Structures are given as C-alpha cells and as structure tokens.
From Swiss-Prot:
Enzyme class name: hydrolase
TM ranges: none
Protein name per UniProt: N,N-dimethylformamidase beta subunit
One Pfam family recorded for the sequence: DMFA2_C
Length: 762
C-alpha cells in the first residue's frame, strides 16, 4: 500500500472563466519539487467491470513544477485576542474569571485563558492539568510559580473559576465553585458535588511579557517571529463570559462572580461576551466582543460551536435568538478545523472557452499523487447547454474525510461486511490534524461534528477513491453520470449546490433540464425553494439518486467554504444536545426536511426509505409502466424486463440507499409508479423516521418500505420530474458497455426533457 506524501486544497469550490482559483499544497518534506497538471475528470471508478478510470489532460498556465514544502496546520478551536501593545500583560495585580464546562477534564493539559509563551515559560495561564485547575505565573527568566486546585473537576459540570495574582501579598489563588442548576450540567441538584474550593500559594515572581496574543481555550506555543501565535493544549468544552480584571479580587468578590454579577465593572481590562452579536440571523461571525469598553475584541479560530447553551441555561428556551443571555458559551474542541491556513503555492485564472465540467489539479510527488477537485461554471449569467448537472457539494462536505468504517462502532454492522480500507483511510487515522473531521464523526469529547470546511485536503473527495464499504461514493460516484453524458454525446453545464444557494432559481431557469448526482442528501432551505419553484414554473428535473434533500444545512455567510448541520433523530451518526438545534450561521432550526413539513416526496416525488451496503437489487416493473402516458420513458424496454440487474455499485441499479413513493408524505397524486426494487437483504432496514415502536420484521426481507421506486409526474406549466430513487442507479449506466435498460431509460427521459416543449402530461 502506498503512503500519502502530498496533499492539497483550493480556496473555492467553483469558478467561471476569467476567475481565479488558488491552490495550497503540503508535502511530507521540503525536499525537491512536485508536478501540477490540470485534468478534466470523466470517470472515477476503477472497477474492472466498467470502462475504467478516465481523465483528460487540459493544458493550463498553472501546469509545471513547484518547490515541495511542509506546511503546518493549526488544529483545534480557540479565540485569539491580539495584544501587541501589552495591555493584557497584567504586570501588576490582576484576576481572571470565567465559567467553564469541561468535557475531557482528564485529557492532559488544556488552556482556558492565557497570555503565555510555553517555550519560554513566560506570562500567565489559567489551565487544566490532570483534571484540576492550575494557575501559573512565569517571569522573563522562565521561573514559574503555580497553584493547583485540591478538587478535581467533574465532567460536563459548570463551574465559576477565578484566578488571582496579588503582588502585594505575594500570593496566587484559585477559587472554584460549581454552578449546577436543573438543566445545565450532566448532574442535577440531587448530586452532592464536593468540588468547591479556594486554594492559595506563595508567588515570588511576576508575569513576564510573553509577546503572544491572549488566547481563550488554549496556550501560546511561543512568541512567533512572524507575529502568528500558534495555539497548543487546546481545551475541550464550553467557556462562558471570561473576564480579566486589573486588580486582585477578594475571596468574597470571587465567590460573588458565581452568581453572574460583575465585580466593579470599571476595573475590568476585558470582558468577552460570546453572546454579543446574536440577532435574528443567529451569530454568523467569528468576531468576539469585549464589552468592557477597552476594545480588546477577539477572533474565533477554527470555528468553535456558537449558539451553545451557557452556564445559566434553564431549559425553558431552545432558540438562542430568543434568549441570548443564556447562550453565552462557546464550545471548543481540540480537533476542529475550518481552514488549514496554508500559504498559497500557485493559482490559475480560468481561460475563456474552458468547458464547464468537473476538474482537478493533479499533483505528483515521487510515487504519491493527489487530486484537488473543483468545478468550472459556464460564463456568469449564461448557459452553454440545455442540460445542467448539479454537483452535490453540500453532501461532499458532509462526508468530507469521514472515518465511519474504521472508527464508528456500528460501521461494520451497517455495511454488512468487513470494511476494506485504503491508503487514504490509513492516512486519516495517522495524521488527522492535516484533514479534520466529517459531520459523520464525533469530536474527541463525543460531540457530533456540526461544521465542515472545503479549505483542507479532503481525501475521500477524489477520483478513484473507494469508501470502506467497498464502493465509490459522492464525487467519484457522480462521475458515472459525467462519463455517460460524454459517451452519449450530450452537452451539459455544471454548477454546484453552493452556486444554487447563492443564485437561487434563476440559475436553474437557464436550463431545460437539471440532473442531480447520486446522493444530494444535504440541502439548504433556499435550494429546496429553488427546486420547487423551478419545477412548478415548468422546469424539468431528473433525480438520479436517493436520500436526497434529507438534512437541512446552512452556509457560513462570512466563510462560504464552511457548512453547518445540526442533527436530530433520524438516519444520523449523532444528535444535537438539548437546546442546540438552531444554526449559529442563520438562526434557523436544523434537522430534517421531513421534520419541517417538507418531505422530499413533495418536490422530487420520492423520499428516503431504507439503506444497506452489502449489495444492490434490481427493479421490477409496476402496472403504471404499461400506461400509454409512460411509453416514451419505457421505449425499448420489454414489459417483463428486469431493470438494472447489473452494475458497478453493489451489482445492481437498486441499492445502497433507497427512496419510496408515498402519497401520505406528499408524492403528487398524479405520479406514475413505474418500477420498484427487490432482492434486498436483511442488512437493509427501515429508517428511524418510519419507526414508532421498533419490532421484528423491519428489514429488507420482510418490510415493504425497503424498496426504491422509479416515478414520473408532470407539474404545472409544462414541468416534469423523473426520479430513480437509488444511489446505485448511476453505477449501472455503463454496465455491459453502456448497453442496458438503465442507460436506455435515462436516455429516453433526458432526450425528451431537453426539448423546447412541455414535458409529457400525466
């Protein structure tokens, strides 16, 4: 097995001719050079039963050799408060107060609030070590004094913590008090927590100038020559309302702070209110406000969770917009990553006339290679074809660098077989801090990952990549469609779901027909609006997928490369904690479209019904397939033919994830049910959405909901919608050298939908 020695990413998902994309690359060493080459991606599946891998070299100004270098990644979330003037040095008496809720108190050293140079042991820091609070003072020579709490912190329990440096009394002290209410902590009022304490120690030194920024949720590694403070010892958990006072608080004042009061506001050097800025659209910013009036504002790094319940949350309000004073916490994780922040290696300005399509910058370093994918749009505001392929970029981000098969306890059970790992899986396991997590993973403290980013190497978003369950997924699977369109001579444009979110229905209206990829599971509310309006106004859609439009997502308005999802009960790897179902990036409730009265059936005709990853079935025709109104769809297919009984994904066209026709969930009543899939194993099961009381008989061998339905309905104003309801459908297009009834049916519908005339009426 080869090892990964080079990896990269680009700054944006898509661009039109005349626009620039920047590329960022890191190699294992800084020796030698690497080669870069622009390629058009055509077929990403190496399955020997298919046409094989296909790419096309495209000459570009960015092609060539570049010096190899290693680029460090800052991992973990924190807040940085620049302090070049030294105003937060606190070289006299000072006190630090914060509320904290630790999720991993026993996991090594973790900074809470600090102005500290760890290399020189200089400055001051409030931190956790071995499950206890530690307050440290270090002078310019590296001599340190510290005081350690004599009571350990309980996991997921809120505390009020005050650290005091008193140079007159030559003491340092810690005040620790639990502030548990009925809802804010793991335990309630009935638990007799023995964790309140005050401890002091003698201090013979005063804090030296660390020449670092003040950090919240970490420690400064060193005073960097380039002015950048690298954060180490990241904290896992929540911090609420940290404050820095320019005097030594008394024990009585320290304990009073546990009630949420502010001791002599005039004496504050800084007071960071993480809820400041919450408004009708959430708190879609990295800015952290200092409300002391001294202007020591901060910046979030690596997207800590915002809109999180604070120390005083009482459970009566679940929307942070309505009660910002109880949502003053940031939830930090040592394994957050919203941007690798590498230096640029090279860029490319897309030339006029470059075909709209799936592309990648292919980079090679010795025997190691990587592909950095992106999407070329048609010229802004124009269409160059009648067909639009909509790349499922929200779902690409949701699954970006997922580690389900080698980290999730249920991964093998869900797959129904032993996982098959490759070099990218091993690389993710060994060097996670290059890559970050997916929304199917949990942070190290167990919290589900709710933010995901494009600005990092995404190893499973590569042609040729195979998931741990043995087949291709997302972008490589969508290339089955691109290859088929090229093989059949169809002209098409490409856009992304991010582009649709920005441009709305106007983007779709430029085209006679819009095609999905294999798995458009994650969508914004605006994208659902655009699809519904497009179809209702006479547009034509082909949903060549399953499990589409299932989870609602939000895009960060200041960082469009960041996507947010907050999950509820359903087909999910995790559920958002109580009180945290609303997106920080737009203030709206997260969860499933179906849970917001918008089941996929209402727009695309079918919606998520079952999943399983051992093998795929095929379709048998239903009576509607012989309806004369469906003759144009079934042209060339005999009435008794099985549809899709071969393919590259699981061996058939009906598999992996399945959607069903369901009038009770909004399938239009004029819909034709053309075919339904069969031969699904017990690995396939009914989704939680359709289970009230679990009982035997919920699997593919027994339950009627375990099926995919091929449907067609016409809409008002000449529109039409065709749905195949299976993730593995596209994998059958090239089966038997493209000579099969999946290809034939898809071609029948696409050829009709391209025409400048209304879709056939039903």
């Amino acid at each position: 097995m080869k090892t990964v020695k080079i990896r990269g990413y680009c700054d944006r998902l898509s661009a039109a001719p005349g626009e620039t994309i920047r590329f960022y690359v890191s190699a294992d060493t800084s020796d030698g050079s690497y080669e870069a080459e622009l390629v058009r991606l055509i077929h990403g599946d190496t399955n020997p039963a298919g046409p094989g891998y296909k790419e096309e070299s495209v000459k570009s100004a960015a092609d060539g050799s570049y010096p190899a270098r290693f680029q460090r990644t800052q991992f973990g979330s924190f807040v940085e408060v620049p302090d070049a003037s030294g105003a937060l040095l606190a070289d006299g008496a000072f006190s630090v107060h914060t509320f904290l809720w630790s999720t991993t108190p026993g996991r090594g050293r973790q900074g809470l609030v600090s102005r500290w140079d760890d290399e020189r042991q200089c400055g001051w820091s409030l931190a956790i070590e071995e499950g206890r609070l530690v307050f440290t003072i270090g002078d310019e020579s590296g001599t340190t004094n510290r005081v350690i709490s004599d009571r350990p912190l309980f996991q997921e329990v809120w505390y009020s913590v005050t650290a005091v440096f008193d140079p007159v009394q030559k003491t340092i002290s810690l005040h620790q008090k639990s502030v548990v209410n009925r809802t804010n902590s793991r335990f309630g009022l009935v638990v007799p927590l023995d964790s309140d304490t005050t401890v002091s120690a003698v201090s013979q030194v005063s804090p030296g100038d660390s020449r670092t920024s003040l950090l919240i949720a970490g420690l400064g590694e060193a005073a960097a020559a380039d002015g950048r403070t690298w954060c180490i010892a990241n904290f896992n958990g929540k911090i609420d309302a940290p404050k820095l006072y320019g005097r030594a608080l008394s024990s009585e004042e320290a304990m009073k702070l546990a009630e949420g009061t502010v001791a002599e506001p005039w004496s504050r050097l800084a007071h960071w209110d993480f809820s400041a800025g919450i408004g009708p659209d959430g708190i879609p910013t990295d800015h952290v406000v200092d409300i002391s009036g001294n202007g020591h504002h901060g910046q979030c790094v690596n997207q800590p969770d915002r809109g999180s319940t604070g120390w005083n949350w009482d459970g009566h309000e679940e929307n942070f917009i309505h009660c910002p004073q109880q949502y003053g916490a940031l939830w930090f994780h040592e394994d957050c990553l919203d941007d690798c922040r590498w230096d640029k290696d090279f860029e490319i300005t897309l030339p006029d006339g470059l075909k709209s399509d799936f592309y990648a910058m292919k980079i090679r370093y010795g025997d190691s290679e990587d592909y950095i994918p992106f999407f070329v749009l048609p010229p802004r505001g124009k269409a160059t074809a009648k067909i639009l392929v909509l790349a499922s970029t929200f779902s690409y981000l949701a699954y970006a660098n997922e580690q389900i098969m080698h980290k999730a306890d249920i991964g093998q059970a869900v797959a129904g077989h032993t996982p098959v790992l490759n070099e990218n899986d091993v690389e993710l396991h060994r060097n996670l801090d290059y890559y970050g997590l997916s929304t199917y993973d949990g942070h190290v403290d167990g919290r589900g990952v709710q933010y995901t980013s494009w600005r990092r190497p995404i190893l499973n978003l590569r042609p040729k990549h195979r998931q741990g369950f043995g087949s291709i997924w997302e972008l490589p699977a969508d290339l089955h469609l691109i290859d088929w369109l090229n093989h059949n001579g169809f002209d098409y444009d490409v856009a992304t779901e991010h582009d649709l979110n920005e441009q709305g229905v106007d983007l779709l209206r430029r085209y006679n027909v819009v095609l999905t990829g294999s798995h458009p599971e994650y969508q914004t509310w605006a994208n659902a609006d655009a699809w519904e309006d497009y179809l209702a106004d006479g547009g034509r859609g082909m949903y060549l997928a399953a499990n589409g439009m299932y989870w609602i997502v939000s895009v960060h308005p200041e960082k469009p490369w960041v996507m947010e999802v907050r999950k509820e009960l359903g087909v999910t790897a995790w559920e958002a904690p109580p009180g945290e179902y609303h997106y920080s990036t737009n203030g709206r409730r997260g969860g499933r479209f179906r849970g917001r009265a918008r089941a996929t059936q209402k727009i695309w005709g079918t919606g998520m019904s079952s999943f399983g990853f051992d093998h795929s079935g095929y379709f048998v025709q239903m009576p509607d397939s012989q309806d004369k109104r469906a003759a144009w769809i079934m042209d060339g297919i005999d009435p008794d033919e099985r549809i899709g009984d071969g393919g590259l994904v699981g061996g058939g066209a009906g598999g992996y994830e399945l959607d069903r026709y369901d009038l009770s969930l909004g399938t239009p009543p004029n819909t034709l049910l053309l075919a339904s899939s069969v031969e699904h194993s017990v690995v396939y099961t009914v989704i939680p959405d359709d289970k009230s009381f679990p009982h035997p008989g919920m699997n593919g061998g027994e339950h009627p909901f375990v099926r995919a339905d091929i449907t067609y309905f016409s809409t008002a104003n000449g529109g039409g919608m065709f749905s195949t309801s299976s993730i593995s459908w596209l994998g059958s297009l090239s089966w038997n050298n493209y000579d099969n009834n999946v290809s034939r049916m898809t071609r029948n519908v696409l050829t009709q939908f391209m025409k400048d005339e209304p879709a056939p009426l039903v």
